[in-house]
């Protein structure tokens, strides 16, 4: 039988099988499982049939609960159906899983296992989610590798048909779902050989049909429910043996044999680890290493977790075992032990006697000691060093039980110590690491490299990619291994023989060379040439190069990319350098393979994109140069080396928590933090992003004072609040740095004052949106404006000083600003700054504006999504506070309940204000009727009103302190009032999130909240896709757009959420687009917050998922409005009370066609290449629908 190999990740490995074996696939995106649904949707779009020759129906639902419901319905009517999920998504499915499992329905749900949100959200892998489903009645089959995930997907589908027990097939999120490995693919005949078609016919025979009507899903009473529930026992009792039989048959077919409980190790092992998931591979590798050196250890891999087979499990254990460590990748606080540990203890307690075939344990085989431990939560590293520490613990006379490994628990002292230098990796494996920016294509190029080596040679290949949670512009670290033997190393590289650093700034922030092995090759993308780079390298980097005798090569990849017309995409260039230096393939062969990959990868994007990439390849090697290392300098800086080792990366002005805790996380040393340093409830300070100084921009904006008209549009659109304006008295310039710029203020309200626009050089991302929107042009040089981009590196030091000086200039009094004028409103201090959002992000300008206007009194409920990640992901937070210590209070609950969560804020704030008012009235004699009346009747509509109310509350507190408190009841009332008094100052509740949240998963919640009539403000940042999970379609996605889950183009019209909200009549509704009409956006925010009732602002937000140049995102917003694809309007119920039409259209009739604006975005253009006839048809429909919608709104606004 011929073997077919492919280099794929776990998600694709599973999806390939699941797609072949199902007819209806209901999907919903959630990291890290989304790619399984994306593959299924893409294959459906290309018309790929399943095993029986029909193309499955792949349907996106509004939530994971919806997907489970759809699958349940499909199963009940006889289809083969599946879904994919993880984490909170699995929790939403659990009610349906109980039903599906209880009805003995054949189906498989595939889970990329992930942490559940507890004290914090985490998108990374562990078994928290699947363990929450272990009582559903689903069998649970666990894969440990990419190959196993491919194989077990088939075994699970075969087993569910043969057993009628529903199956949950899970594998570790990221470590398996995203790890790229060379795997042997299952042929259709392999798949067909395991599927019993008679069982499929039986499944269909059980379907609900009016041709043979049945009733299922009854309500039962106490007299029979218990008995009926026990009736399923025979199915579960038979299940393990059936699964093992299928595994045996699979082995005969493929040569890959599996056991439901599989032992590997010494036949006479005295110590044993029991484990599930990708950790099995690491333990397997370590067991082989230790046994080769005289140890007697083993590993038992648990494949079938449910139903548990006591007899088979105990028989799999070696008779010689004396001590067992059970490792769980989850934490269940308050339990007697984690799930796998408890099952093992129970199984051995019940089964060990039978193992020895005697009524009591024999002397030769005493019951082993069993201890449990936790490892790997939220993808925490699990290395051979940690495995060895577990075995060493087992060797102790009294081993530590309920231990943790991989952390330093200095609070409850559960952790085991381990030697991080212990390694099991063979020397003949190529280990390469690449440090890249999230937007530079490094990860994509490395995936191509793996395919080139894995599929073009006999070598095995492994790729794993580590991301920080910043968006585009984040740091990515790619870990690639190549070798002649299968690679089991499911952990990060710590001894690399090749390191590529693709961004110069990383050398200043991160210990890039710590993982370099002695004599390794270093490739550096450098703005300095080979002759000058040495003197510009940070001292610590030079010391490491000398100490480890590293070889250094440099290339100015950014310059090569610019010369080739590729902008900031340096991936192909650095890939060529890697193959030239690493010697994995002959250079000529490697370059030929790279060019083939370019044509395949970028062919859909057009001939020009392919040409530019090919040109970059041809120009690369002539620009690659080796650096001569001055060996004579070794030992020159011994004193400096000692100094550097004790130096904090942050200034002493940073708070201690920032320096000692967040600072470690910022430089990727968070693994070293002990338990005691971290808040146990997940509460963190705000205002910490200002300390990060990422320095990711190659170019920053420079202000031209002679051209500027002081409109502040550049300030308003800046996604990262990195460019700001101030007016101030000339006397403030007395100690200004010599390069600090200022001009006379042009606004007559600031006569005789100075005006400055200043950029934060180390916080700017270089998106250039400020330049794009600047209306002021240099008449003598039309290509220049009042803001122009220039290289950051030469400007960094002087602009850092200028920024520090600028921050110390006084902010204008908020009470004196005309907030309806952008040039004055943008003088307000933003309380959202330097987020991890993409360069050029379309969402963050709205969030920033919100905080400028209302941040000092706002409480934010943030739906999970892009905004919760760039707004609330460690290490730093962009939400900040003003000099008075006031600022937005922020929290994230879940994706599916954010509207209700924020509604809870409002209920609480109103109740506390009500209680405070009740108490206040009881003290009118003590504090004075005038003060009480002025507080209770304060209008609180303007900045001045808010300021005055705060003064009254301060006076109230002072008066309360003067009241004698001999009476305990009186003292309690005073304490209560003092604790609640601040709630008598108006608080602004904002419920924010993206369109996936608002249009889909929590639409019901939003509907309920706005129907309540309560005073909440909802901001929907509409990117028209699920941006956070990678750009999947939502009900906000417009017709004809290609998105993940809509690979054939979205056939349905965009949901008109604003119209739905207007139907209530008592809701303020606005549709805005900052790039189209900034003053209308400002009006909408002011009116929404002022409206005493529910308000919703739907804000168009351009996104990288649209396939646009983000620099021109604001232009795209304008084009959208001019074509009528996006409407600008405000619906204000207060106007109705004045006898006016509440709906105001804030735009003219469309002046360009839908086609003109659509085809500026790749998400629409893609369809014209892949399905031109479909694209033409959908375009015509889209134009007709835009025209009809415009006419309807015109009619409604003119009544």
Curated annotation (Swiss-Prot):
* Gene Ontology molecular function: any one: 4 iron, 4 sulfur cluster binding
* Origin organism lineage: Bacteria, Bacillati, Cyanobacteriota, Cyanophyceae, Nostocales
Q: Which residues bind [4Fe-4S] cluster 3?
A: 838, 841, 866, 1103
List the induction conditions.
Answer: By iron deprivation.
Q: What is this protein called?
A: Pyruvate-flavodoxin oxidoreductase
Q: Which domain of life is it from?
A: Bacteria
One biological process term from GO is: electron transport chain
The UniProt family comment states:
Belongs to the pyruvate:ferredoxin/flavodoxin oxidoreductase family.
What Pfam families does this protein's entry cite?
EKR, Fer4_7, PFOR_II, POR, POR_N, TPP_enzyme_C
The top EC class is oxidoreductase
InterPro entries documented for this protein = 4Fe4S_Fe-S-bd (IPR017896), 4Fe4S_Fe_S_CS (IPR017900), PFOR_II (IPR033412), Pyruvate:ferred/Flavod_OxRd (IPR050722), Pyrv-flavodox_OxR_EKR_sf (IPR037112), Pyrv-flavodox_OxRtase_EKR (IPR019456), Pyrv/ketoisovalerate_OxRed_cat (IPR019752), Pyrv_Fd/Flavodoxin_OxRdtase_N (IPR002880)
Q: Which keywords does the record carry?
A: 4Fe-4S, Electron transport, Iron, Iron-sulfur, Metal-binding, Nitrogen fixation, Oxidoreductase, Repeat, Transport
Q: Write down the species.
A: Nostoc sp. (strain PCC 7120 / SAG 25.82 / UTEX 2576)
Cofactor(s), names only, from the UniProt record: [4Fe-4S] cluster
Recorded catalytic activity of this chain's protein:
oxidized [flavodoxin] + pyruvate + CoA + 2 H(+) = reduced [flavodoxin] + acetyl-CoA + CO2
What region holds the 4Fe-4S ferredoxin-type domain? 699-728, 755-784
């Amino acid at each position: 039988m011929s073997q077919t190999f492919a280099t794929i990740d776990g998600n694709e490995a599973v999806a390939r099988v699941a797609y072949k074996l199902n007819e209806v696939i209901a999907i919903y995106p959630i990291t890290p499982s989304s790619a399984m649904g994306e593959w299924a949707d893409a294959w459906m779009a290309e018309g790929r049939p399943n095993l029986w020759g029909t193309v499955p129906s792949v349907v996106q639902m509004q939530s994971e609960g919806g997907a489970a419901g759809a699958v349940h319905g499909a199963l009940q009517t006889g289809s083969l159906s599946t879904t994919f999920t993880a984490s909170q998504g699995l929790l939403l499915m659990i009610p349906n899983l109980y039903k599906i499992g209880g009805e003995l329905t054949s189906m498989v749900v595939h889970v990329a296992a992930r942490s559940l949100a507890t004290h914090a959200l985490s998108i990374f892998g562990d078994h928290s989610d699947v363990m929450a489903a272990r009582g559903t009645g689903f069998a649970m089959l666990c894969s440990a590798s990419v190959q196993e995930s491919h194989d077990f997907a088939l075994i699970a589908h075969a087993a569910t048909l043969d057993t009628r027990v529903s199956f949950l097939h899970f594998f570790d999120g990221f470590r398996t779902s995203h790890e790229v490995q060379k795997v042997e693919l299952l042929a259709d005949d392999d798949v067909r050989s395991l599927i019993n078609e008679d069982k499929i016919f039986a499944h269909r025979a059980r379907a609900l049909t009016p041709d043979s009507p049945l009733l299922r899903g009854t309500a039962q009473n106490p007299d029979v429910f218990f008995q009926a529930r026990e009736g399923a026992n025979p199915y579960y009792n038979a299940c393990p043996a059936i699964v093992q039989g299928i595994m045996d048959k699979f082995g005969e077919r493929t040569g890959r044999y599996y056991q439901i409980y599989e032992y590997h190790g010494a036949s006479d092992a005295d110590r044993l680890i029991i484990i599930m998931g990708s950790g099995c591979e690491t333990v397997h590798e370590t067991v082989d290493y230790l046994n080769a050196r005289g140890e007697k250890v083993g590993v038992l891999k648990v494949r079938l977790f449910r139903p548990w087979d006591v007899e088979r499990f105990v028989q799999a254990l070696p008779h010689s075992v004396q001590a067992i460590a059970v490792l769980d990748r989850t934490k269940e606080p308050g339990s007697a032990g984690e799930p796998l540990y408890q099952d093992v203890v129970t199984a051995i307690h019940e089964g060990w006697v039978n193992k020895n075939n005697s009524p009591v344990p024999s002397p030769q085989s005493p019951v082993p000691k069993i201890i449990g431990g936790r490892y790997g939560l939220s993808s925490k590293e699990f290395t051979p060093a940690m495995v060895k520490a577990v075995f060493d613990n087992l060797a102790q006379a009294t081993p530590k039980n309920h231990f943790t490994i991989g952390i330093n628990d200095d609070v409850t002292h559960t952790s085991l110590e381990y030697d991080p230098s212990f390694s099991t990796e063979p020397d003949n494996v190529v280990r390469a690491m690449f440090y890249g920016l999230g937007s530079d294509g490094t990860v994509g190029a490395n995936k191509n490299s793996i395919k080139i080596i894995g599929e073009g040679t006999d070598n095995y290949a492994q790729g794993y990619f580590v991301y920080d949670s910043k968006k585009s512009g984040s740091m990515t670290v790619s870990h690639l291994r190549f070798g002649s033997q299968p690679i089991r190393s499911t952990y990060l590289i710590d001894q690399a023989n090749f390191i590529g650093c693709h961004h110069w700034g990383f050398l200043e922030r991160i210990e890039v060379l710590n993982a370099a092995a002695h004599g390794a090759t270093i490739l550096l993308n450098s703005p300095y040439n080979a002759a000058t780079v040495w003197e510009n390298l940070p001292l610590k980097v030079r010391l490491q190069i000398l100490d480890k005798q590293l070889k250094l090569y440099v290339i100015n990849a950014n310059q090569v990319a610019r010369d080739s017309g590729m902008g900031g995409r340096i991936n192909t260039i650095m890939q060529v350098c890697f193959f030239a230096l690493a010697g994995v393939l002959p250079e000529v062969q490697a370059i030929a393979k790279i060019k083939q990959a370019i044509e395949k990868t970028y062919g859909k994007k057009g001939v020009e994109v392919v040409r530019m990439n090919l040109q970059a390849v041809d120009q690369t090697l002539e620009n690659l140069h080796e650096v001569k290392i001055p060996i004579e300098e070794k030992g020159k800086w011994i004193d400096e080396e000692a100094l550097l080792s004790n130096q904090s990366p942050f200034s002493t002005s940073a708070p201690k928590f920032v320096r000692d805790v967040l600072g470690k996380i910022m430089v990727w040393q968070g693994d070293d933090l002990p338990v005691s340093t971290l808040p146990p409830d997940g509460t963190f300070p705000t205002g910490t992003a200002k300390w990060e100084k990422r320095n990711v921009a190659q170019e920053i904006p420079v202000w031209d004072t002679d051209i500027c008209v002081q409109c502040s549009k550049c300030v308003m659109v800046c996604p990262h609040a990195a460019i700001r304006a101030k007016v101030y008295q000339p006397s403030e310039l007395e100690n200004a740095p010599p390069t600090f710029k200022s001009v006379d203020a042009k606004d007559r309200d600031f006569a005789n004052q100075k005006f400055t626009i200043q950029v934060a050089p180390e916080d700017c991302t270089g998106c250039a949106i400020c330049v794009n929107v600047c209306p002021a042009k240099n008449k003598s040089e039309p290509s220049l404006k009042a803001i122009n981009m220039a290289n950051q590196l030469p400007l960094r030091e002087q602009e850092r000083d200028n920024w520090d000086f600028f921050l110390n200039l006084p902010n204008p009094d908020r009470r004196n600003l005309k907030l309806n004028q952008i040039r004055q409103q943008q003088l307000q201090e933003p309380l959202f700054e330097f987020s991890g959002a993409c360069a050029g992000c379309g969402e963050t300008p709205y969030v920033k504006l919100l905080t400028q206007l209302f941040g000092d009194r706002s409480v934010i409920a943030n739906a999970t999504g892009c905004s919760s990640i760039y707004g609330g992901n460690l290490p730093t937070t962009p939400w900040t506070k003003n000099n008075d210590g006031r600022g937005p209070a922020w929290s994230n609950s879940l994706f599916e309940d954010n509207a209700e969560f924020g509604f809870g804020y409002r209920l609480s704030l109103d109740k506390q204000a009500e209680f405070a008012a009740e108490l206040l009235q009881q003290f009118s004699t003590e504090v004075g009727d005038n003060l009480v009346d002025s507080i209770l009747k304060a209008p609180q509509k303007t900045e001045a009103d808010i300021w005055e109310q705060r003064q009254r509350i301060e006076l109230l507190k002072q008066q309360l302190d003067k009241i004698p408190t001999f009476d305990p009841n009186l003292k309690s009332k005073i304490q209560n009032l003092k604790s609640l008094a601040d709630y008598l100052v108006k608080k602004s509740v904002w419920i924010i999130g993206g369109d996936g949240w608002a249009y889909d998963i929590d639409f019901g919640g939003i509907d309920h909240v706005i129907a309540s009539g309560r005073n909440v403000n909802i901001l929907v940042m509409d990117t028209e896709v699920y941006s956070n999970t990678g750009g999947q379609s939502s009900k906000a996605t417009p017709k004809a757009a290609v998105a993940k889950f809509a690979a054939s183009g979205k056939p349905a019209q965009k949901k008109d959420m604003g119209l739905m909200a207007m139907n209530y009549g008592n809701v303020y509704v606005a549709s805005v687009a900052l790039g189209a009409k900034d003053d209308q956006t400002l009006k909408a925010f002011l009116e929404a917050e002022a409206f005493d009732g529910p308000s919703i602002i739907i804000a168009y937000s351009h996104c990288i998922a649209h396939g646009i140049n983000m620099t021109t995102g604001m232009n795209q917003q304008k084009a959208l409005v001019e074509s009528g694809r996006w409407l600008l309007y405000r619906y204000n119920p207060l106007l109705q009370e004045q006898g006016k039409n509440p709906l105001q259209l804030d735009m003219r009739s469309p002046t360009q066609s839908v086609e003109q604006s659509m085809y500026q975005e790749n998400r629409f253009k893609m369809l014209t290449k892949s399905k031109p006839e479909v694209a033409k048809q959908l375009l015509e429909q889209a134009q007709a629908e835009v025209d009809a919608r415009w006419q309807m709104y015109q009619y409604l606004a003119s009544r």
